[in-house]
Curated annotation (Swiss-Prot):
SUPFAM superfamilies: C-terminal UvrC-binding domain of UvrB (SSF46600), P-loop containing nucleoside triphosphate hydrolases (SSF52540)
Subcellular location field: Cytoplasm
Keywords: ATP-binding, Cytoplasm, DNA damage, DNA excision, DNA repair, Excision nuclease, Nucleotide-binding, SOS response
Protein's recorded name: UvrABC system protein B
Signal peptide residue numbers: none
Gene Ontology biological process terms, A to Z: nucleotide-excision repair; SOS response
Domain Helicase C-terminal: 435-597
Domain Helicase ATP-binding: 31-418
InterPro entries assigned: Helicase/UvrB_N, Helicase_ATP-bd, Helicase_C-like, P-loop_NTPase, UVR_dom, UVR_dom_sf, UvrB, UvrB_inter
Region spans: Disordered: 1-23
Ranges of Basic and acidic residues composition bias in the record: 1-10
Length: 663
């Protein structure tokens, strides 16, 4: 039995106190949640401390909370911040555990079957298990997740019911415990003791839970009774302390008992017979043979091992769901009365909507050509409507809320004041005629003041032409486009901040990590060309890039005033007015944000006599040197992950993948 602790409150620890309009935003959000409001929007301008406000709300409403971000990097940053704010509570991280993932697919035009290929990140897998076990054991839980949280995960009831509960004095034989551990997918390994394994030494069983990476547990028997349970260091075996209750959750999220497994296999066999009959009636003998061979192999593995590669494709039968019924996801592990916060909701909600369609198109091809049973289509992400059905209370957080969020609620809480007193930038609209000369003059003014400039264009060609022109004029300039890899992008931003060059040109400079306090000018070319990057939301996001500097200024080059431009200008002016009034009333002098410049990733290069640290020329390396570089990077990636620097770890991961592709 799981003893769930539901009385521990969230305890926020911070050297800051709410300032600006944070107190009003926190109070309004909390009052609305306690008053039963289902949905509300926190409209927070860039740099106003939205994460701190979210933390204050969580600590006051005291509900288990799911925070969803639109990518792993952002989720990692939020996870680190929440860990600092809530050191005594369970802050968990739940994202896709694949470092590399090539989904199973079939291309009929070339008769090419692509086997599923993936590389699982052991650290993230541990964190996922930690998240689900925390949700079943306690109430003071914050899970920071990417949209992976809407993908199928296995039944929380089966997961909880399969848990092995142990206490000192409990009557259970050693062999019974070993059988129970095997049933929940733990492996016996007396030599290489790692997560998801157990080892046996006489009357002592040591178990390494899937949710830990340093500490394991030692269960000591006296006859058919547990004498003592100790927490131990997994590496040295040193005892940390005794525990009076140990719950061991399954080593995989897809788990089922023997009786249920036989029922599931019977359903899989019935579906197989039905699909084979259909293929044979249509004369698709190759597809029928393929499906029979693959499915019968999987059934044999399930029967003998309780697991098979691609077991998730049979999740509908394992969970006992009807065709078309939504899969179990992380959301089902939460209690009914939980809170959802959607960070950067204008991006994240679009992702939640789009996940289902892309997944179904690929899987339908596998079903049509006999690679999978039709039930594989039910191993899928949630549809948006299904996601909505899980929502008890939700807060959308964004500087520019999308149409979807606005359609869900009329309750909008604004957070416009920055703790630094910084104002939204002033905006000029200038004609496109003569824009190059005008822009060059503005750039030179910034260079003279040791400030930087962002220029955003609409096309790759224009960005390239503008880069060439400014170089001819003696400006130190770089162009950042979509082909540039993650690590190189980080290096470019660092060089911009250090003053290696003064101007950065790009098409979409809204990506995370592009907040540069040294940028005092943002120039928007073709501002009057309506579209994704020139709509109201896109313009406000771009304008926000200049909001980190006290001299922040935006120039829109356009021949006409579009509705989007006018709305973006009006909204920025409205916010600026509020900020000026607040600063005046409280005697605040705006200050440019101070932000440390992180060093570029470098690895050790070994020569015959010495080791020097320098940036590597990977292209000219031999295969052996690249292998050494990969090993060094993997070590640094693990160190970064242990320090909770997931942004750095993700950059390392991307570089490792690039190096592997060179071979």
């Amino acid at each position: 039995m799981i003893d769930k602790r539901d009385d521990k409150p969230f305890k926020l620890k911070s050297k800051y106190k709410p300032s600006g309009d944070q107190p009003q935003a926190i109070e309004s959000l909390v009052d609305n949640i306690e008053g039963g409001e289902k949905a509300q929007i926190l409209l927070g301008a860039t740099g106003t401390g939205k994460t701190y406000t979210m933390s204050q709300v969580i600590s006051k409403v005291n509900k288990p909370t799911l925070v969803i971000a639109h990518n792993k990097t952002l989720a990692g940053q939020l996870y680190g911040e929440f860990k600092e704010f809530f050191p005594d509570n369970a802050v968990e991280y739940f994202v896709s555990y694949y470092d590399y993932y090539q989904p199973e697919a079939y291309v009929p035009s070339s008769d090419t079957y692509i086997e599923k290929d993936s590389s699982v990140n052991d650290e993230i897998d541990k964190l996922r298990h930690s998240a689900t076990s925390s949700l079943l054991e306690r109430n003071d839980v914050i899970v920071v997740a990417s949209v992976s949280c809407i993908y199928g995960l296995g039944s929380p009831k089966e997961y909880a019911d399969s848990a092995v509960s142990l206490r000192p004095g409990q009557e259970i034989s050693r062999d019974t415990l070993l059988n129970q551990l095997v049933d929940i997918q733990f492996e016996r390994n007396d030599i290489d003791f790692q997560r998801g394994c157990f080892r046996v030494r006489g009357d002592v069983v040591e178990v390494f839970p899937a949710s830990r990476d340093e500490h394991a547990f030692r269960v000591e028997f006296f006859g058919d009774e547990i004498d003592r349970i100790c927490e131990i260091e997994s590496l040295t075996g040193k005892t940390i302390g005794e525990v009076d209750h140990l719950v061991l959750f399954p080593a995989t999220h897809f788990v089922t008992n023997d009786e249920h497994m036989e029922q599931s296999i019977a359903k899989i066999q019935a579906e197989l017979a039905e699909q084979l009959q259909l293929f044979e009636s249509e004369g698709k003998l190759l597809e029928a043979q393929r499906l029979r061979q693959r499915t019968e192999y999987d059934i044999e593995m399930l029967r003998e091992m309780g697991y098979t590669s691609g077991v998730e494709n049979y999740s509908r039968h394992m969970d006992g769901r009807s065709p078309g019924e939504p899969p179990y996801t992380l959301l089902d592990f939460f209690p009914e009365d939980f809170l959802i916060m959607i960070d950067e909701s204008h991006m994240t909600m679009g992702q939640i909507k789009g996940m289902y369609n892309g997944d179904q198109a690929r899987k339908q091809m596998l079903v049509d050509y006999g690679f999978r049973l039709p039930s594989a289509l039910d191993n899928r992400p949630l549809r948006r409507k299904e996601f909505e059905s899980h929502v008890h209370q939700i807060v959308y957080v964004s500087a520019t809320p999308g149409e979807y969020e606005m359609s869900q609620t009329n309750t909008i809480i604004e957070q416009i004041i920055r703790p630094t007193g910084l104002l939204d930038p002033e905006i000029d609209v200038r004609p496109s005629m003569g824009q190059m000369d005008d822009l060059l003059g503005e750039i030179n003014q910034r260079v003279a003041r040791d400030e930087r400039t962002f220029i955003t264009t609409l096309t790759k060609k224009m960005a390239e032409d503008l880069t060439d022109y400014l170089k001819e004029m003696g400006v130190k300039v770089k162009y950042m486009h979509s082909d540039i890899k993650t690590l190189e992008r980080t290096e470019i931003i660092r060089d911009l901040r250090l003053g290696v060059f003064d101007v950065l040109i790009g098409i979409n400079l809204l990506r995370e990590g592009i907040d540069v306090p040294e940028v005092s000018l943002v120039a928007i070319l073709d501002a009057d060309k309506e579209g994704f990057l020139r709509n109201e939301r896109g313009l406000i996001q771009t304008i926000g890039r200049a909001a980190r500097n006290v001299d922040g200024h935006v120039i829109m080059y356009a021949d006409k005033m579009t509705d989007s431009m006018q709305r973006a200008i009006d909204e920025t002016a409205r916010r600026r007015e509020i900020q000026i009034a607040y600063n005046k009333a409280h005697g605040i002098v705006p200050q440019t944000i101070k932000k440390d410049i992180r060093g570029f990733i470098s690895i050790s290069k070994t020569s015959h006599n010495d080791i020097s640290k320098e940036e590597m020329d990977y292209e000219s390396m031999s295969r052996g040197e690249r292998k050494e570089a990969i090993n060094a990077l993997q070590k640094q990636m693990q160190e970064a992950a242990e320090l909770l620097d997931f942004e750095l770890a993700a950059q390392m991961r991307d570089l490792i993948l690039e190096l592997k592709l060179m071979d």
